[in-house]
Amino acid sequence: MYNLRMAESVTEGHPDKIADQLADALLDEFIKKDPYSKVSLEIMVTTGLVMVGGELTTESYVDIPRVVRSVIKDIGYTRPELGFDADTCAVVQSIDEQSPEIALGISSEGAGDTAIVVGYATKEAPNLMPWPITIAHKITKRISEYRKIGKFPFLRPDGKVLVAMIYEDGKPSYVQSIVAYVHHDPDVSINHLRELIIEEIIKKEIPEEFLTEKTSIKVNPTGRFVIGGPVADTGLTGRKIVSDAYGDIGLSGGSAFSGKDPTKTDRSGSYLARMIAKHVVAGGWAERCLVQIGYAFGLTEPVAFDIETFGTEKISKEILEDAVKKVFPLRPAEIIEFLDLRKPIYRQTSVYGHFGKENLPWEKLTKLEELKELLD
């Protein structure tokens, strides 16, 4: 029996990802100066304009236009011909103080928002992530890297990759297709571009066992991609939530991450859920694990908790859930302290996925021995 799984990744110059990076870069700046800042920011980017909106309570001052221009420059929008330029874009702000009713709920160490959060892990890839999203992120990250270091100087910042993979009996078999859309200068030959992207990036980022004669690879199948970035599409925070997470394999709780401080449980709770799922798979108690937690605004305890292992479990669900609840902190305030989330770590999460990066605290297997004492 076989089925198809897919995942999408975008480069850091994609309009929606520009917005996510700006939101998290600003969050980092506020947290750096005031770790207890309450931040909920939304960003819109379009031709020649960045709009920053949201709610904020903090003791710190951040020069928002300066941060915005610095991030846009770092991404690579530094030429007027791109239609969006770090030096000339307008930066408009409309930021209010956080609602006192929301502040009251958080001050009692309750959840800063009502949220369904999910975390997923699978033994497929070395980082215990699904292969489709892992491959997609590897390709887009390499495209951006080669642009920035000047190896492919004709590349522009925007881009997108879609990966479709065939699974047989629940296990990854081969990559069925990859479609890449790569933003480029007008004077590069489309055939030369396609050859370089396919041979120097895509084929080198797919594990050999997944690359077969059945694999279809297409680059810019519609032709030229010269007009890109915010001049071509308006970008908004929170529009790449499946790409931010696990692709189409792991469920999504529906909430976005970027621009939110850790009192927002749709962010911090999702990080803990991933950590739990990763521990379950790393410990050998299941081959796949989906953790779902429900939080309600102002309440200090989760209102729902579930672990799904898709028939791959080596131990009963009841025993597993009981051990997890004993080992991991599930209260919002405890999650923040446990994962040390009042530090400026968020911009790095805003591109190429929030999960699977081994340097992030929720990817560490720090509770594995405690779980083994209860389960082995």
Swiss-Prot record:
| Record-linked CDD domains | S-AdoMet_synt
Query: Which parts of the sequence bind K(+)?
Result: 42
User: In which family does this protein belong, per the annotation?
Assistant: Belongs to the AdoMet synthase family.
* Keyword Repeat annotated: no
Molecular function GO labels: ATP binding; magnesium ion binding; methionine adenosyltransferase activity
How does the annotation summarize its subunit structure? Answer: Homotetramer; dimer of dimers.
- SUPFAM superfamilies, per the entry: S-adenosylmethionine synthetase
Cofactor: how bound? Binds 2 divalent ions per subunit.
Residues recorded as binding Mg(2+), renumbered to this chain, are 16
User: Which PANTHER family does the UniProt record give?
Assistant: S-ADENOSYLMETHIONINE SYNTHETASE
> For this protein, what reaction is catalysed?
L-methionine + ATP + H2O = S-adenosyl-L-methionine + phosphate + diphosphate
Query: What species was this sequence derived from?
Result: Aquifex aeolicus (strain VF5)
Its annotated pathway? Amino-acid biosynthesis; S-adenosyl-L-methionine biosynthesis; S-adenosyl-L-methionine from L-methionine: step 1/1
An example of a Gene Ontology cellular component annotation for this protein is:
cytosol
Its function? Catalyzes the formation of S-adenosylmethionine (AdoMet) from methionine and ATP. The overall synthetic reaction is composed of two sequential steps, AdoMet formation and the subsequent tripolyphosphate hydrolysis which occurs prior to release of AdoMet from the enzyme.
- Could you confirm whether the keyword Nucleotide-binding appears in this record? yes
Q: Which InterPro entries match?
A: S-AdoMet_synt_C, S-AdoMet_synt_central, S-AdoMet_synt_N, S-AdoMet_synthetase, S-AdoMet_synthetase_sfam
Q: Which GO terms describe its biological process?
A: one-carbon metabolic process; S-adenosylmethionine biosynthetic process
- Which of UniProt's keywords are assigned here? ATP-binding, Cytoplasm, Magnesium, Metal-binding, Nucleotide-binding, One-carbon metabolism, Potassium, Transferase
Q: Which residues bind ATP?
A: 14, 158-160, 224-225, 233, 239-240, 256, 260
Name any one Pfam family assigned in the record. Answer: S-AdoMet_synt_M
Protein name per UniProt: S-adenosylmethionine synthase
Q: Which residues bind L-methionine?
A: 55, 98, 233, 264
**Gene3D superfamilies from the xrefs?**
3.30.300.10
